[in-house]
Amino acid sequence: MKCVASKFNMWLHLGWLLGLLLVLLPLVRCQGWGEPRFETGNVENISLAAYNEAQLQQDVWMVEEMDAPFVLLYINYQGPSEPTIRESPADLDARLQLSEGGRWSIVINRRQDYEVHQRSSLILLAVESTAIPYAIVVNLVNVLDNAPVMTAQGSCEIEELRGDFVTDCLFNVYHADGFEENGIGNSSTNELSFEIGDVAGARDHFTYVPSTVTPSQPIYNKLFNLKVLKQLDYTENAIFNFITTVYDLDRTHSFKMSTIVQVRNVDSRPPIFSRPFTSERIMEKEPFYATVIAIDRDTGLNKPICYELTALVPEYQKYFEIGQTDGKLTVHPIDRDAEQNELYTFTIVAYKCHNRLLNTSSEGAIILLDKNDNIPEIYMKPLELEFWENTIMELPFDELVIHDRDLGENARYEVRLAETVAGVQQTTDSFTIIPGNGYQRVSFTININNATSLDYELPERQTFVLHVTAHEPIEPTHESTQPITIRLKNWNDEVPKFGRDEYQISVPETIGAGELLATVTVTDRDIDDGIRLFALGRLAESLSVTELPVSAEPETNLPLYGFEIATKVGDIFDYDIAKEVIVQLQAEDTLRTAKQESLHQIFSQLTITVIDVNNKPPQITLPRGTMHILENSVPDSAVIIGEEQIAQIIGTDPDTEAELEFSIDWSNSYGTKSGIRAKAETYENCFYIHEEKVNRQRTIGTIRVNPTFPLDVDHEMYDTLFLVIRLVDRNQTILPNTVETVVAIQIDDENDNAPYFDNSTLTVVRSVKERSDSGVTIGNIIAHDIDGPGNNEITFAMEPIDPAHKGWMNIDDNGIVRVEGNRSIDCDIPPIDKVLQNVTISDWKWSNWHVFEIVLMDTNNKQPYHDPFPNDGQVYQFEKIPSNTAIVRVEGKDQDRDVPYHTVSYEINYRDFPQLQRYFEVDSTGRVYVKENNDLLDRDAGLESIMINIVMLDNAGGYDIQNRVSTNINLTLLDINDHTPKLPELAADELKVSENAKQGYIVKTPFAALDLDDKRTPNAKINYYIEEMTPELETPLFSLENIDEYNAVLRVAQDLKGFYGTWTLKIKACDRGSEYEPIIPLTEEPKDNCETRDYELTVEPFNYNTPSITYPSRSAQLRLKYESLQNGRPLVETNGSPLPKFEAIDDDGGIYGDVTFSLTSTNDGEQDHEVFRVDKVDNKTGLLVLENSLAVQPFPKNYSITVIARDGGDRQSEAAIHVVFINMTGEPAFLEPTFDTDFTENEEGRDERRQLPFAEDPKNAGLPPGAETNVYYFIDKTYGNASHLFQLDRVSNVLQLAQLLDREEIPTHEIRIVATNNENGPPDTVLESSPSLLVVRIKVNDVNDNPPVFQQRLYAAGITTNDRVPKALFRVYAEDPDEDEIIRYELVNGTAVGENLQTDGLPFRLHPDSGELTLTSKVQPNQNGYYQLTLIAFDRDDTHNDTVPAKVYIVSESNRVTFVFLNSVEEIDQPDVRKFLAQELTGAYEMECNIDDIDQTTASDGRQAGGSSSALTDVRTHFIQDNQAVEASRIQQRSSNRTFVTVLKTTLRTRGLSLQDVPPLATEALTEADETLQIILIVVSAALAVLCVILFVAFFIKIRSLNRQLKALSATDFGSISSELNGKPTRNVPTTNIFSIEGSNPVLNDNEFRDRMGGSGGGVYDDLSLQSEESDFNDVDRDIFAPKRKESLNPALLEHIRQRSLNPMANGTDKSNDGAPTSNHKKLDETDDELSHRF
């Protein structure tokens, strides 16, 4: 307020005197003040409240962390007094300062921290009077200057398969600026936000939500729970490890924390088979074992797996078993042949043993392999056949089947037939069996294919045996044979007759086999007839009928057929069944007449009386019901059934003379007690059988107690006897004569034994705890009574020996001892160790007793305690107490009985006070001391005092209850100067300064070192120095100045332009510990502690630099595994290690050094980069991952991509790389399928080596040497026929010879190389298309090891006087099998044989290269004979040579024969063709033929006049016989034979030579003049002859034409024969088609046809006749000598002819287009008019 107003108010209210005093005071105080009294110069950070004049108080609010020094406020005072600060907090370091404008200001020299300093301070400012100061209240305003800190409250584990819920994973966020409402800058409440790093989809799965739990110090802490948004899957991610970034208000500060979330596996997935069973082929009738393994897909739980097997066909379940827990599959032996099945399918179900619903199944199958264990079995009905003799038929079998129950080749068999005739077995040609082989079960037929041998008149054929044999071709021992009896039938017409009507005999029932029963005779009047006798009825198969020799009946002399009837087998009669047996006898004759009558059959009977014989064993009949007897029964007591019925055992025998006797077989009898065998001596002979004989065939036996048995029948020894009862027939002579049976006899019990205690129950120790509850079981007492049920029921009673123990325990009827009184047992006061109890046992008849001890067990029911501590446990010590320093001793006590319970142990309560575990321990005596290797008790770390919680406990080492009592000790720590000031670890951003920074620019303020000592002492006050800067400069770039006792400011000392780079400042900070004076004496002298630290200050440049990619390098190839590719997952190199991160360097700072990677395709038009992406890892690295794994193609696909590294300033660099995905399972591959190389033949090639190309292993693509997977090379032995000639180093792939080569034998070889990773060799089979194969073509280099060889062994030629000089006579040719040989020819010598021949020099020259022999001088007419020459061919090095003779004959032209061929010179003039031609002509004419020359046929020869072909070649030859030239006439004479020439042509055509002619010998040469004249005469004669012929032909044709024209001009009657009109024409006439219709007018002119022709000219135009050129009216109006144009005629005459002529040609216009317009000729359509028909 203004001073005047204050004075006026005081005057009015307080009176004059008081008013005067008051007026004087304001006048003094208001003197020199302006309005407002206080103001701020920093309205953004400092605000002032309204001045309170009543209290002389000015409130000031300023934000924290303002750079000191700064002006707090200005004082608008200009008075005479000098303001002073009477009082101010040291933290403010407030000072008065006079500004340039003359105003006073209060300057704060220390930086203020809301979280450290006082939040409200008072400054007393004295202006006019020190007694009445102005109060300036300074309030700090909190600003957001601290980063949040996030910590996890324990581990985080979340169950899977549950979504959208809040977990119990708790996280605490601490913020030093707090969370008070409107507590930050008076503007807003601090708010937190979270960001989850998107690693493995964590951002989609989790979020943070506020927790309902209230944290400690909620102003600074907030708790958050992790919420699951999308359910987790343990199989996809068992652990999430992601970065959580927490931001405070407006994302001002952040904090990153690595968050680990463990997914808890939930039991929800079915098992999966890790070793399934699919199918197996096993041998039948053999067991098979396998193991099936399934694992829990919930791998975190790994629950046990159970197994179950179900056969698809329930009937086959019996063959399969599987272990429920071990998965052991057992297949029992299966008889495939019996089941007739090879495939057995089943399902194996694996399920979790605790939850059957979680299961998975797998289909399995067993395929049985057949075992060849069955032979072919023949099933045949009947086995005997009768059929008519000499008849083609199929044998009438009801069944003829062969069956082999095996499978496959084991079931194949072959069938053959044989026959036994007259006792001799032989192959048969009479029968055939169809088919001849079979498989498994096949029906067969047997046919007669040769009936001539089946002749009844042959005695051996009347009855014979046919054998059917089946055998397996693969196992000859598997064979079966079935004989068939074949009987041939004859015809008959007489009825046979028995000798008697009835036959009677008697036989014993035991008659044996082969015994004669009766002789039967039959007579038959047929001649050559026979009788067969049959025994009919049931015994027919058991009797044999034997035919006796045919004799004559004495009376009638008829054939008498006798038969003996005998037994086939023994024991066919049974007296007890039938005492008399009647057998029907049937006799049948066997002869049929041509009438085909039926066979005659007669009957008789044989009556057999059976005589009884004792031959049957006896039988035993047991009674119904249970047989039993009471134990201890008196002798002769009988075994009974039911209550009193005596058990009777009945023995019978059907034989009449039987003598039966019972007995007991004690050696096979036995007794049991409760199913256990009893000792034989306790029951043996205890019973005997009392017999009562009813008759000889029946005896009754009863089992009785044996009087001679020394013991009693005892139920306690055995409760059941199993007796073997034997019945014997003493009179039976035929064994067996006995029968046995087993009977069971129960031994009944009676109460004859007293109960007794079990031995073990007498020695067992029983105990009970004191204070046990009622009903607690102490133990049980076991007693036995060996009597049976009803006699062994035991009751128990118990009484304590000491009456004081009554009511503590009781016993029930089962012998169980329990606590009776509730918590009534006490063993502590007084101490009691055991209780004695007398237990009595009894049944209804007997009793027994025993005293038992029951031990009492002490319980820990007394609490430990201790005496009080002095000073209530308060202890003082200096901080950092040494180890083993004692703090206090605790003495505990306890009143329990047992030593463990009253022995007190000590421990520190680490559970509730985990901090104590770092510092203290307590020993068994209660001594509390500082532990060994303890954490320092550091007061400067905030531990000014600590409470030690000591726990006393008894029973420390036991497993029972422990009683715990705790007590506290309070320890106060005093400070020592044990900390060196820790210079701050400044972030790079804090030490970065722009290159444009100017002098005085503050780099860091405050620059504060941290000294953990007590800030209230000099131990924490710090001085700062810059000791050194590197690199060194004369003038320092930076300065460091203290701004208070704790902080300094780092400034730029000069402009930084041009000083870009990193500068290291060595800064030293020292505390003032030497000034420290503690309350208690220190153990050491105080001193100052100093620390020096290097700081790197970065002077940030402008963005002058471009990022440089360090990985991958340019043109690098990244080799990645093709297996298990997933989108977004790290890629793996072929060596199994993860692909390194992409990295680039950029020396620029900030965003200019923040590099981001991107990709593009290197090649235009390709999209290789779309398969990948680069995930950013940090500012210099990125991770290459897949964007689309399904589109990835393996090697040889090469992804060409360009990696782009771009910094924040849009500068970028690129690196083109290649990415290949290697299939690590691929085989090596050659780049080319073939390779050519060479080796030298002979010894020269033995030491040669050839490096073959290496195979490219896809697994080695791009690998450096030494890192590749080894590739081995082998020669494929199965390829070609040259592999044995070579050997190959399998590692180096170097090829060398195994055998020497011969190029002349084989010039090239071909082998195949197989590349593989298997060092033991290639696989057995390799696909022909496999790239692992390399075909090596080997050329054999030649060595000059062969001489040249002439193609011919003799060369010959002929020369004449007409031969030109020089003339090539012939060309020699030598071949050298060596390669690239150069042959040199040489004429070495020669001789002349004949007359007048040169002897001094031969007239020949041999070209050394071409081998051509040339005539060098002309042959003289007086020379004759021949030259004998020797020619030599040398090879390149003159190492080898060959010699051949040559002859040159001097012949005349009459000796030369020219053969003309339809071939070119090049086709014939070849050495081999010349040789062939000379040989063939020599052989054909039987004279030596020599070819003189070969030349093209010239036109002057006259043979080309026809111009048929230009490829005619003359081969001039001469023939030599006896060294003399043969006249050509002889050759031409021979050539006149057409057959000879045809054969010769055919022979020559085999080499493509077409012989055309053998010209005759040319006449002798004429003189030149004669020759010219002759030619002229011939030409003139020929011309005259041609003219005569032309004239004759012309006149003949003209006359004929005129005759036709005259005849055509004459008119004939229409329809007459001569007109040939209206009838069938016989010649082509132009008007034939026009006037062929009756009624047409033949006399027409062109006017009538003008309209038809569509123009002004012409009439009917018969183009058909005209085109045929066969019309008789052609050229009828033309002059013979005129040209063929109508214009040549006189126009008047032409018009006259047109008007009168019938010839349409005359009426038509001229068709010539020679200079005239083309006539508009049109062919008439057939439908235009009936006159237009043409044929």
UniProtKB/Swiss-Prot annotation:
<feature type="region of interest" description="CR11-MPED, increases toxicity of activated Cry4B toxin, peptide alone is not toxic">
    <location>
        <begin position="1358"/>
        <end position="1569"/>
    </location>
</feature>
<feature type="domain" description="Cadherin 5">
    <location>
        <begin position="621"/>
        <end position="757"/>
    </location>
</feature>
<feature type="region of interest" description="Disordered">
    <location>
        <begin position="1701"/>
        <end position="1735"/>
    </location>
</feature>
<dbReference type="GO" id="GO:0031528">
    <property type="term" value="C:microvillus membrane"/>
</dbReference>
<dbReference type="InterPro" id="IPR020894">
    <property type="entry name" value="Cadherin_CS"/>
</dbReference>
<feature type="compositionally biased region" description="Polar residues">
    <location>
        <begin position="1701"/>
        <end position="1719"/>
    </location>
</feature>
<feature type="domain" description="Cadherin 3">
    <location>
        <begin position="379"/>
        <end position="498"/>
    </location>
</feature>
<feature type="domain" description="Cadherin 9">
    <location>
        <begin position="1136"/>
        <end position="1235"/>
    </location>
</feature>
<feature type="domain" description="Cadherin 1">
    <location>
        <begin position="171"/>
        <end position="273"/>
    </location>
</feature>
<feature type="region of interest" description="Extracellular domain (EC)">
    <location>
        <begin position="166"/>
        <end position="1456"/>
    </location>
</feature>
<feature type="topological domain" description="Extracellular">
    <location>
        <begin position="31"/>
        <end position="1574"/>
    </location>
</feature>
<feature type="short sequence motif" description="Toxin-binding receptor motif 2">
    <location>
        <begin position="1446"/>
        <end position="1456"/>
    </location>
</feature>
<dbReference type="GO" id="GO:0016324">
    <property type="term" value="C:apical plasma membrane"/>
</dbReference>
<keyword id="KW-0732">Signal</keyword>
<feature type="topological domain" description="Cytoplasmic">
    <location>
        <begin position="1596"/>
        <end position="1735"/>
    </location>
</feature>
<dbReference type="GO" id="GO:0005509">
    <property type="term" value="F:calcium ion binding"/>
</dbReference>
<feature type="region of interest" description="Membrane-proximal EC domain (MPED)">
    <location>
        <begin position="1457"/>
        <end position="1569"/>
    </location>
</feature>
<feature type="transmembrane region" description="Helical">
    <location>
        <begin position="1575"/>
        <end position="1595"/>
    </location>
</feature>
<keyword id="KW-1003">Cell membrane</keyword>
<dbReference type="GO" id="GO:0007156">
    <property type="term" value="P:homophilic cell adhesion via plasma membrane adhesion molecules"/>
</dbReference>
<keyword id="KW-0472">Membrane</keyword>
<keyword id="KW-0812">Transmembrane</keyword>
<feature type="domain" description="Cadherin 11">
    <location>
        <begin position="1351"/>
        <end position="1461"/>
    </location>
</feature>
<feature type="domain" description="Cadherin 6">
    <location>
        <begin position="767"/>
        <end position="866"/>
    </location>
</feature>
<keyword id="KW-0677">Repeat</keyword>
<feature type="domain" description="Cadherin 10">
    <location>
        <begin position="1255"/>
        <end position="1350"/>
    </location>
</feature>
<protein>
    <recommendedName>
        <fullName>Cadherin-AgCad1</fullName>
    </recommendedName>
</protein>
<feature type="domain" description="Cadherin 4">
    <location>
        <begin position="499"/>
        <end position="620"/>
    </location>
</feature>
<feature type="domain" description="Cadherin 7">
    <location>
        <begin position="879"/>
        <end position="983"/>
    </location>
</feature>
<feature type="domain" description="Cadherin 2">
    <location>
        <begin position="280"/>
        <end position="378"/>
    </location>
</feature>
<comment type="function">
    <text>(Microbial infection) Binds to and is probably the functional receptor for B.thuringiensis subsp. israelensis (Bti) insecticidal toxin Cry4B. Trichoplusia ni insect cells stably transfected with this protein become suspectible to Cry4B; cells undergo oncosis, they bleb and ruffle after 20-40 minutes, swell after 40-60 minutes and lyse after 90 minutes. Following toxin treatment in the T.in insect system levels of intracellular 3',5'-cyclic AMP (cAMP) rise 12.5-fold; EDTA but not EGTA pretreatment prevents cAMP increase. Inorganic phosphate also rises 3.4-fold after toxin treatment.</text>
</comment>
<feature type="domain" description="Cadherin 8">
    <location>
        <begin position="985"/>
        <end position="1109"/>
    </location>
</feature>
<feature type="short sequence motif" description="Toxin-binding receptor motif 1">
    <location>
        <begin position="1344"/>
        <end position="1350"/>
    </location>
</feature>
<dbReference type="GO" id="GO:0098609">
    <property type="term" value="P:cell-cell adhesion"/>
</dbReference>
<keyword id="KW-0130">Cell adhesion</keyword>
<dbReference type="InterPro" id="IPR002126">
    <property type="entry name" value="Cadherin-like_dom"/>
</dbReference>
<keyword id="KW-0106">Calcium</keyword>
<dbReference type="InterPro" id="IPR015919">
    <property type="entry name" value="Cadherin-like_sf"/>
</dbReference>
<feature type="compositionally biased region" description="Basic and acidic residues">
    <location>
        <begin position="1722"/>
        <end position="1735"/>
    </location>
</feature>
<keyword id="KW-1133">Transmembrane helix</keyword>
<keyword id="KW-0966">Cell projection</keyword>
<comment type="function">
    <text>Cadherins are calcium-dependent cell adhesion proteins. They preferentially interact with themselves in a homophilic manner in connecting cells.</text>
</comment>
